[in-house]
Each structure stands twice: as C-alpha cells, then as structure tokens.
Amino acid sequence: MNAVGIDVSKGKSMVAIMRPFGEIVSPPFEIKHTTSDINSLVELINSVEGESRIVMEHTGRYYEVLAHQLSKANLFVSAINPKLIKDFDNDSLRKVKSDKADAVKIARYTIDKWQNLKQYNVIDELRNQLKTMNRQFGFYMKHKTAMKNNLIGIIDQTYPSVNTYFDSPARSNGSQKWVDFASTYWHVDCVRKMSKNAFIDHYKNWCKRKKYNFSKSKAEEIYEKAKELVPVLPKDNITKLIIKQAVDQLNSVSTTIESLRTLMNETASKLPEYPVVMAMKGVGTSLGPQLMAEIGDVSRFTHKGAITAFAGVDPGVNESGSYEQKSVSTSKRGSSVLRKTLFQVMDVLIKTHPQDDPVYQFIDKKRAQGKPYYVYMTAGANKFLRIYYGRVKEYLSSLPES
C-alpha cells in the first residue's frame, strides 16, 4: 500500500510517498509539469513495491495535466475536493501551511480513505472542449453585462432611457435594436434637430437598412419623447467617439457570445445524450449544451443523490440528540456554474408553465404552499436533476455498445 500525495500548483507540484504507520517511502520532492518530469514520476511509482494510489486536489485546472497523464500511464488517480483535504485530520494547534506539509497531509488522507477513493475518469476531448467553451461563454456573458451597463451609463448622458425604447430579442449575430439605434441616434439632438416628418422618413430608411420592423406610431413616440429630454454631454465629436467605442465593444462581445452559443450546440449534438436532454422541458439549444457541459458523463455518478450533491442542490441535515431541524438550507458545496444553469432552466419552466411537465408541477405545488423563491427553485432543480439522471442513464444503457 503506497500512498502518493500530490500538492498541485501552477506548472509544478510537490509529491510525497508514504505507507501505513507513517513510513516515508519518499520525502516531499518537487516536479515540473513537463513530459520528462512526469515520466520520471511514473517510473518512480512503478518501481515501488505494492499497490500505489495517487491523490491530488482538483484545484482549478492545474491538476488536469497530472491527472490525465498519470491515468494514461494506468495508475490509480483520485482527484479530491480541496475542502475534504482541508478538513482532514486537523488535530494540531499549530498552523503549518507549506507545499511539503500539504503533500504529506494528502498522502495521509490517501491511506485513511484508501477503500473509499474513486478513480479519476479521463474526460474525453469532446466533453472537455464543451466544458471549456461553456466557461468561456460565462466569462463573456459577464463582460457583456459590464459592457451593456457601461453603454447605458454613457448614453443616459446624451439620450436618456433610449435602452428602454425597444424590447426586441438579440439577433443570431448578437446585435440588438436599441444598441443599433443608439449607435445612429447617439444624441437626443440627432432626433429633435430634424422636423417630425424628416425623422420619420429617416427612421423608416434606417429600419429598412438594418432590416428591422418599422412602425410610424413608434417613430412619432420617439420624436415626442426626444423633445422633452435633457442631455448632459454636448453633441460633438468627442462625445460621439466615446459612445461609438462603447457600442463597438458591446457588439464585439455579443458576436463572440452568439458564435460560442452556436458552436456549443453543434459540439453537444455529437454527444449520445443530446436528444434526451433536448427533449426535456425548459431546455433549449442554449441551456441544453450548458447542462451537458457542466454535468459531464452521467455514468460516473453511482446514484441520483450523487448528481444532486455534485450540483450542491441536495437538502442539508442538522440533527443533534433530540433536536432535528425541519428546514435546512442546501449544501451549496457543488458546482456554482451548474446551479446557475439549473436556476435558468427553472426560470424558463416558470415562464412557459408546461402543465404536463412533472418538474413544473412540483414547482407550482411548492409555490402554492407559500414556499419562498429559493426554496421552490432549489427543490425544482433537485427534481430536474434526478429526472435528468434517470432518463439519460436509461437511454445510454439502451444504446448498443461501441
């Protein structure tokens, strides 16, 4: 029994090899995340007599290089939640935090949890690409929100509340009507310096050129509102440049998001569970690929409770002696990205209210009972995941083995 504890960091790791009763096989030593160093580590582990198991924390993405390469070398690798390592064996008043001490602690954890360690599954390239794209998608969505708020903050000084004039959804290229309008009519004087009929004609030609629907009543409403607005910034080239730059930045990130959304759907369609996931209510070509990206291969979960714990939507427990708390908040120890996606699915269900969907029926029942928002949304996410697990696993088991 050889326990290999690896404290992973960016570009390098600290390794310690131990046996039961504190026997040191190899004191902590550092390796680089290079082919030569990893191969040397594999040779060292294989040279040690007895079964070896390797444990590391799944910290960010740093651990993936080692986990992937060591698994390919047919070694037993287990990636553990850092929280479990941190809470393990805290029986000392001294606070020691170093890479060497952490590597030894992970090795001791390996010995203590030997029978319960779960082997790391190498994520196939397609799922890995999909998950990476989804994380990039989330990154750009945050930037889009920031860019949008930035543009609204600037445009409110030249054309107040112009962002509320249109509620058209974003196009497939990411463009939005109010953003295009603000780019052309970037100052309130761009509208009210014209006569009413001249603006209506100009707006009509703009709609035709941009391929938007034209409404004369809407044009008249815009013109009448413009006469009452009070701008702060002057109508000059400097102000125009500031607004144009903000519009260009927002359009750029919007285009990137929509191209990623399309690419994610194309990639997800190559996965075997795609038709089952897409058939579920509340899931479309955007949220479906996001779900598959974050959940990954369902077969790695042993039961329904495992997948809800992975998402952090499993109900908590608080009992002590004769005390038993009836309402306990969820663990929230799982993937926050997956929880966000699940809440978006629940939001779609609430807005579309499909009466024949069991998840919506469950949410509606909880709402009727007067449950708070987060309670019924989390309960719905838990039920959705359980159904997801059952349907996908049943479908995958029915497929012929390749």
Regions found by a protein language model. Give the residues of each.
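A detector of single, family-specific signature residues
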Residues: M1-S402
